[in-house]
Protein backbone atom coordinates (compact mmCIF):
# COMPACT_ATOMS: atom_id res chain seq x y z
CA UNK A 1 0.00 0.00 0.00
CA UNK A 2 2.84 2.36 0.88
CA UNK A 3 4.60 1.51 -2.40
CA UNK A 4 1.51 2.53 -4.37
CA UNK A 5 1.20 5.80 -2.45
CA UNK A 6 4.87 6.52 -3.15
CA UNK A 7 4.38 5.81 -6.87
CA UNK A 8 1.39 8.15 -7.06
CA UNK A 9 3.42 10.88 -5.39
CA UNK A 10 6.42 10.43 -7.68
CA UNK A 11 4.22 10.40 -10.79
CA UNK A 12 2.16 13.34 -9.63
CA UNK A 13 -1.14 11.62 -10.41
CA UNK A 14 -4.23 10.55 -8.49
CA UNK A 15 -4.74 7.09 -9.98
CA UNK A 16 -2.63 4.44 -11.73
CA UNK A 17 -4.24 2.83 -14.77
CA UNK A 18 -2.53 -0.57 -14.46
CA UNK A 19 -0.69 -1.71 -11.34
CA UNK A 20 1.51 -4.81 -11.60
CA UNK A 21 2.92 -7.21 -9.09
CA UNK A 22 6.12 -7.35 -11.08
CA UNK A 23 7.37 -10.62 -9.62
CA UNK A 24 5.36 -13.23 -7.77
CA UNK A 25 6.50 -13.59 -4.15
CA UNK A 26 7.14 -17.27 -3.49
CA UNK A 27 6.71 -16.72 0.25
CA UNK A 28 3.33 -14.98 0.11
CA UNK A 29 0.12 -16.62 -1.15
CA UNK A 30 -1.00 -14.88 -4.32
CA UNK A 31 -4.45 -14.55 -2.75
CA UNK A 32 -2.99 -12.33 -0.04
CA UNK A 33 -1.08 -10.17 -2.50
CA UNK A 34 -3.99 -9.66 -4.87
CA UNK A 35 -6.29 -9.13 -1.90
CA UNK A 36 -4.14 -6.17 -0.85
CA UNK A 37 -3.99 -4.88 -4.43
CA UNK A 38 -7.77 -5.18 -4.64
CA UNK A 39 -8.05 -2.69 -1.80
CA UNK A 40 -6.09 -0.19 -3.90
CA UNK A 41 -8.77 -0.50 -6.59
CA UNK A 42 -11.51 -0.05 -4.00
CA UNK A 43 -9.75 3.07 -2.69
CA UNK A 44 -9.64 4.53 -6.21
CA UNK A 45 -5.85 4.57 -6.36
CA UNK A 46 -5.61 1.92 -9.10
CA UNK A 47 -7.92 1.13 -12.02
CA UNK A 48 -6.72 -2.36 -13.00
CA UNK A 49 -4.39 -5.08 -11.73
CA UNK A 50 -1.68 -7.04 -13.49
CA UNK A 51 0.80 -9.82 -12.79
CA UNK A 52 4.25 -10.50 -14.20
CA UNK A 53 6.17 -13.77 -14.46
CA UNK A 54 3.17 -15.72 -13.21
CA UNK A 55 2.42 -19.29 -14.25
CA UNK A 56 -1.12 -20.33 -15.33
CA UNK A 57 -2.10 -21.79 -11.94
CA UNK A 58 -1.08 -18.58 -10.18
CA UNK A 59 -2.98 -16.47 -12.70
CA UNK A 60 -6.15 -18.48 -12.14
CA UNK A 61 -5.86 -18.22 -8.35
CA UNK A 62 -5.27 -14.48 -8.53
CA UNK A 63 -8.18 -13.94 -10.91
CA UNK A 64 -10.56 -15.52 -8.40
CA UNK A 65 -9.69 -12.81 -5.87
CA UNK A 66 -9.96 -9.89 -8.31
CA UNK A 67 -10.08 -9.69 -12.12
CA UNK A 68 -6.59 -9.54 -13.58
CA UNK A 69 -6.42 -7.22 -16.59
CA UNK A 70 -2.96 -8.06 -17.91
CA UNK A 71 -0.16 -10.58 -17.49
CA UNK A 72 3.35 -9.54 -18.46
CA UNK A 73 5.40 -12.65 -19.21
CA UNK A 74 8.21 -13.36 -21.64
CA UNK A 75 6.92 -14.67 -24.97
CA UNK A 76 8.70 -14.69 -28.31
CA UNK A 77 9.77 -17.00 -31.11
CA UNK A 78 12.80 -17.80 -28.96
CA UNK A 79 10.70 -18.63 -25.92
CA UNK A 80 7.40 -20.12 -27.00
CA UNK A 81 6.55 -23.10 -24.79
CA UNK A 82 5.76 -21.36 -21.48
CA UNK A 83 4.56 -18.27 -23.33
CA UNK A 84 1.91 -20.29 -25.11
CA UNK A 85 0.94 -22.05 -21.87
CA UNK A 86 0.38 -18.59 -20.38
CA UNK A 87 -1.59 -17.46 -23.43
CA UNK A 88 -3.96 -20.39 -23.11
CA UNK A 89 -4.74 -19.39 -19.52
CA UNK A 90 -5.11 -15.68 -20.22
CA UNK A 91 -7.50 -16.39 -23.07
CA UNK A 92 -9.63 -18.63 -20.89
CA UNK A 93 -9.96 -15.76 -18.42
CA UNK A 94 -10.21 -12.84 -20.85
CA UNK A 95 -6.85 -11.36 -19.81
CA UNK A 96 -4.50 -9.41 -22.09
CA UNK A 97 -1.03 -10.92 -22.51
CA UNK A 98 1.80 -8.38 -22.53
CA UNK A 99 4.91 -10.15 -23.85
CA UNK A 100 8.14 -8.57 -22.67
CA UNK A 101 11.45 -9.28 -24.42
CA UNK A 102 9.54 -10.11 -27.64
CA UNK A 103 12.82 -9.80 -29.54
CA UNK A 104 14.64 -12.19 -27.24
CA UNK A 105 16.81 -9.40 -25.79
CA UNK A 106 18.04 -8.62 -29.32
CA UNK A 107 18.80 -12.24 -30.20
CA UNK A 108 15.92 -12.28 -32.70
CA UNK A 109 17.03 -9.06 -34.40
CA UNK A 110 19.90 -10.80 -36.17
CA UNK A 111 22.48 -8.49 -34.60
CA UNK A 112 23.96 -11.08 -32.23
CA UNK A 113 26.14 -13.73 -33.86
CA UNK A 114 28.53 -14.40 -31.01
CA UNK A 115 29.65 -13.17 -27.59
CA UNK A 116 31.78 -10.56 -29.34
CA UNK A 117 28.65 -8.73 -30.42
CA UNK A 118 27.76 -7.90 -26.82
CA UNK A 119 29.64 -5.13 -24.99
CA UNK A 120 31.80 -5.94 -22.00
CA UNK A 121 29.73 -5.99 -18.84
CA UNK A 122 26.46 -6.62 -20.69
CA UNK A 123 24.28 -8.67 -18.33
CA UNK A 124 23.15 -10.86 -21.23
CA UNK A 125 26.58 -12.45 -21.13
CA UNK A 126 25.43 -14.10 -17.90
CA UNK A 127 22.31 -15.57 -19.54
CA UNK A 128 22.68 -19.20 -20.68
CA UNK A 129 20.92 -18.53 -23.99
CA UNK A 130 23.85 -16.27 -24.93
CA UNK A 131 26.51 -18.84 -24.01
CA UNK A 132 28.29 -21.75 -25.71
CA UNK A 133 26.30 -24.29 -27.68
CA UNK A 134 23.02 -22.61 -26.74
CA UNK A 135 24.16 -19.42 -28.44
CA UNK A 136 25.13 -21.35 -31.57
CA UNK A 137 21.72 -23.05 -31.64
CA UNK A 138 19.89 -19.76 -31.25
CA UNK A 139 21.94 -18.02 -33.92
CA UNK A 140 21.06 -20.85 -36.32
CA UNK A 141 17.38 -20.38 -35.46
CA UNK A 142 17.62 -16.66 -36.17
CA UNK A 143 19.22 -17.31 -39.55
CA UNK A 144 16.06 -19.16 -40.56
CA UNK A 145 14.03 -16.16 -39.48
CA UNK A 146 16.34 -13.82 -41.40
CA UNK A 147 15.75 -15.77 -44.59
CA UNK A 148 11.99 -15.29 -44.34
CA UNK A 149 12.46 -11.61 -43.43
CA UNK A 150 14.47 -11.03 -46.60
CA UNK A 151 11.65 -12.52 -48.65
CA UNK A 152 9.14 -10.24 -46.90
CA UNK A 153 11.47 -7.25 -47.36
CA UNK A 154 11.55 -6.40 -43.70
CA UNK A 155 13.99 -6.72 -40.83
CA UNK A 156 14.04 -9.83 -38.62
CA UNK A 157 12.78 -7.72 -35.71
CA UNK A 158 9.80 -6.52 -37.75
CA UNK A 159 8.98 -10.05 -38.85
CA UNK A 160 9.15 -11.39 -35.31
CA UNK A 161 6.88 -8.64 -33.98
CA UNK A 162 4.44 -9.09 -36.88
CA UNK A 163 4.26 -12.81 -36.10
CA UNK A 164 3.56 -12.09 -32.45
CA UNK A 165 0.86 -9.53 -33.26
CA UNK A 166 -0.74 -12.01 -35.65
CA UNK A 167 -1.29 -14.45 -32.77
CA UNK A 168 -4.26 -12.38 -31.58
CA UNK A 169 -5.60 -8.96 -30.64
CA UNK A 170 -5.25 -9.87 -26.97
CA UNK A 171 -1.46 -9.68 -27.28
CA UNK A 172 0.34 -6.36 -26.68
CA UNK A 173 4.14 -6.80 -26.97
CA UNK A 174 6.45 -4.28 -25.32
CA UNK A 175 9.85 -4.33 -27.05
CA UNK A 176 12.46 -2.30 -25.23
CA UNK A 177 15.08 -0.11 -26.87
CA UNK A 178 17.46 2.75 -26.18
CA UNK A 179 17.33 4.19 -29.70
CA UNK A 180 14.58 6.12 -31.49
CA UNK A 181 15.47 4.46 -34.79
CA UNK A 182 14.60 1.09 -33.25
CA UNK A 183 11.24 2.41 -32.11
CA UNK A 184 10.53 3.55 -35.66
CA UNK A 185 11.67 0.18 -37.01
CA UNK A 186 9.48 -1.72 -34.58
CA UNK A 187 6.41 0.36 -35.41
CA UNK A 188 6.76 -0.62 -39.06
CA UNK A 189 5.88 -4.17 -37.99
CA UNK A 190 2.27 -2.98 -37.78
CA UNK A 191 2.24 -2.63 -41.57
CA UNK A 192 3.45 -6.15 -42.33
CA UNK A 193 0.78 -8.53 -43.52
CA UNK A 194 1.54 -12.20 -42.98
CA UNK A 195 -0.36 -14.89 -44.85
CA UNK A 196 -1.33 -18.18 -43.21
CA UNK A 197 1.55 -19.75 -45.14
CA UNK A 198 3.97 -17.10 -43.82
CA UNK A 199 2.85 -17.77 -40.26
CA UNK A 200 3.27 -21.50 -40.76
CA UNK A 201 6.81 -21.09 -42.11
CA UNK A 202 7.81 -18.78 -39.28
CA UNK A 203 6.36 -21.13 -36.68
CA UNK A 204 8.19 -24.08 -38.22
CA UNK A 205 11.45 -22.11 -38.30
CA UNK A 206 11.22 -21.57 -34.55
CA UNK A 207 8.93 -24.22 -33.05
CA UNK A 208 8.19 -24.38 -29.30
CA UNK A 209 11.26 -25.60 -27.46
CA UNK A 210 13.68 -24.76 -30.28
CA UNK A 211 15.31 -21.92 -28.38
CA UNK A 212 18.27 -23.12 -26.32
CA UNK A 213 19.42 -22.06 -22.87
CA UNK A 214 17.43 -20.62 -20.00
CA UNK A 215 16.30 -17.00 -19.94
CA UNK A 216 18.24 -16.08 -16.81
CA UNK A 217 21.05 -17.50 -14.66
CA UNK A 218 20.05 -20.44 -12.44
CA UNK A 219 19.46 -18.40 -9.28
CA UNK A 220 17.26 -15.89 -11.07
CA UNK A 221 15.25 -18.67 -12.71
CA UNK A 222 14.12 -19.70 -9.22
CA UNK A 223 12.29 -16.38 -8.91
CA UNK A 224 10.41 -16.28 -12.22
CA UNK A 225 7.35 -18.01 -13.65
CA UNK A 226 5.97 -18.81 -10.20
What are these regions (language model features)?
Residues 1-10, 55-59:
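Short, acidic/polar
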Residues 8-25:
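Active-site groove signature of glycoside hydrolases
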Residues 24, 28-204, 209, 221-226:
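Beta/alpha (TIM)-barrel catalytic core signal, keyed to glycine-rich beta->alpha loops juxtaposed to Asp/Glu
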Residues 214-219:
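Short coil/turn segments at secondary-structure boundaries
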Amino acid sequence: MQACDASLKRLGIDVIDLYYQHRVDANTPIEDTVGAMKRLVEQGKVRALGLSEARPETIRRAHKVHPIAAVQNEYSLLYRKEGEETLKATRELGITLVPYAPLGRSMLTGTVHGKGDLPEGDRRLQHPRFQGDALDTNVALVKRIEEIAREKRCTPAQLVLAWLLAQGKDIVPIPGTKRKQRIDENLEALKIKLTPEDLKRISEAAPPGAGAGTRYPAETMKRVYL
